Each structure stands twice: as structure tokens, then as C-alpha cells.
């Protein structure tokens, strides 16, 4: 969901409904969904994230349903409703990437230190995310919008596969800006925070090769969890902010 203040976790006990995309209603319309929620985990995550200085609210008594970023993975990975689901807002409109990295790290700490169970993190976003210009959508249904964005994505994927996380984390703000990142790639910052940020020593295992969709760059990859200390996680920004900050600072 799109958020403008704090971070939000949708942890209702049960989700059921029908979804139509407000972005591409002719592509995704009346999609039925149902899954079990996990109120206990959602509330724990919010508590620990807030303790880490990242204000996070858990919503269990809500009529708000999951959206595209949650529903698409569920359609292909949870048709039997085996897994419980917690939805974390990642379309962040006025947030610091550093705070999203800290959020991811705090969630890992919550799970490893306080939760009795196995949890998977799904960062549901994209690489470059420049939709095809109006009138050209059919032509770019299975293409990336520009050669620049396609080459930019290709280099990023190679960095992931080679484990070049220090370089990638350093370039993430500029990549998010110049690559038209969906939600400014806060989902990626959260994922890398959970993995240890630039300290992370794993390599991405590409499940489906890079492909274009409506002008955007897409991939499915698995990032194995490795032992880390958290020493490279960026400090929080929002809770330490004092009045107006420039756009460059917020990035």
C-alpha cells in the first residue's frame, strides 16, 4: 500500500476478497484471493522495529486488504493457503532508504530472537520500473522501456550474482532515481537490511531470467541468508530528523 508517514504492517487474522488493480485494471481484474494472516508476528515486528527507532504500526483489526505486491506472489506460491501472510507497506512516498534498511534488520532481529517459527521475506518490487508511454503499451508488453534501463538492470543483476553488495548498496539511491524504481526501491532496501546490507556475503540465485513487462524490468531471485553482525546497517534518519531536510539528504 502507498504510505506517507511511518511504516505499516497489515496483520489481519484472515484475508479474503477480490482484487482489481487501480493501475492496470484491464490486466488484473476481479482476482479472487484468500490466505491466513499472522497477527502475532505482525505485532512483534512492529514492536521491535519501533524499538530500533523506525516507527511502525501493526493493523490487525482492519478492512484493508493486501494489494498487488502481496497478491501476485501468493497466487503462485500459496494457492493451498499453507503459509500465513503478513503484508508490509513498501510504496513509501516520503521515507529514507536508510530507515527501510534498518526496518529490514529490525525484522530479522525480531524473528531470530523472539519468534518461534520459520519466516520468508519476499521483496515484491522490480528492477527498473518505467512503464511504456501511453499508446505504446501493447508494443512493450514484453519489453523494457529503454536500452539504458535494460543495460542498467543487467549490470545490477551481475552485481547481485557476484555478491558485490558494498557497491550495490552505495549506488542504490541513484539506481532508484535513474531507474524509475517502484516505490523508490524501498522493498530492496528492506530486503538488503534484513540480509545485513553491505556486510551481506551471499550471492543471488536467479530463478527466472531477466524479462521485460510493460516497459519494466523483472526478475525472480533467491537471496540465501548468511550470518552477519549488523555493523553496516545505516543509522535511522526520520527519528533523528530536525526540521526540513533537502531532497538529496532524504535519498
Language model segments and positions:
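Short, small-residue-biased leader/transition segments that mark boundaries at the very start
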Residues: 1-3
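Acidic/histidine-rich, metal-coordinating catalytic segments
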Residues: 121-129
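Flexible, D/E/H-enriched segments
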Residues: 5-102, 113, 134-250
Amino acid at each position: 500500500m502507498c504510505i506517507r508517514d511511518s511504516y505499516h504492517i497489515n496483520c489481519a487474522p484472515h484475508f479474503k476478497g477480490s482484487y482489481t488493480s487501480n493501475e492496470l485494471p484491464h490486466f488484473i481484474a476481479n482476482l479472487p484471493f484468500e490466505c491466513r494472516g499472522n497477527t502475532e508476528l505482525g505485532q512483534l515486528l512492529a514492536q521491535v522495529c519501533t524499538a530500533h527507532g523506525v516507527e511502525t504500526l501493526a493493523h490487525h483489526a482492519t478492512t484493508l486488504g493486501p494489494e498487488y505486491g502481496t497478491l501476485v506472489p501468493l497466487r503462485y506460491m500459496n494457492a493451498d493457503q499453507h503459509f500465513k501472510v503478513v503484508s508490509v507497506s513498501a510504496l513509501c512516498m516520503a521515507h529514507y532508504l536508510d530507515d527501510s534498511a534498518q526496518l529490514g534488520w529490525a525484522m530479522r532481529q525480531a524473528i531470530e530472537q523472539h519468534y518461534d517459527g520459520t519466516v520468508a521475506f519476499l521483496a515484491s518490487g522490480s528492477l527498473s520500473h518505467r512503464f511504456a508511454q501511453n499508446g505504446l503499451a501493447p508494443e512493450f508488453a514484453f519489453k523494457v522501456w529503454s536500452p539504458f534501463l535494460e543495460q542498467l538492470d543487467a549490470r545490477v543483476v551481475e552485481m547481485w550474482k557476484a555478491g558485490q553488495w558494498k557497491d550495490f548498496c552505495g549506488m542504490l539511491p541513484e539506481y532508484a532515481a535513474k531507474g524509475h524504481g517502484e516505490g523508490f526501491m524501498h522493498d530492496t532496501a528492506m530486503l538488503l537490511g534484513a540480509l545485513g546490507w553491505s556486510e551481506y556475503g551471499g550471492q543471488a540465485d536467479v530463478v527466472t531470467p531477466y524479462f521485460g513487462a510493460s516497459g519494466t524490468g523483472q526478475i525472480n531471485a533467491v537471496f540465501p541468508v548468511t550470518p552477519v553482525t549488523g555493523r553496516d546497517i545505516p543509522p535511522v534518519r526520520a527519528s533523528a530528523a530536525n526540521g526540513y531536510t533537502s531532497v538529496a539528504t532524504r535519498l
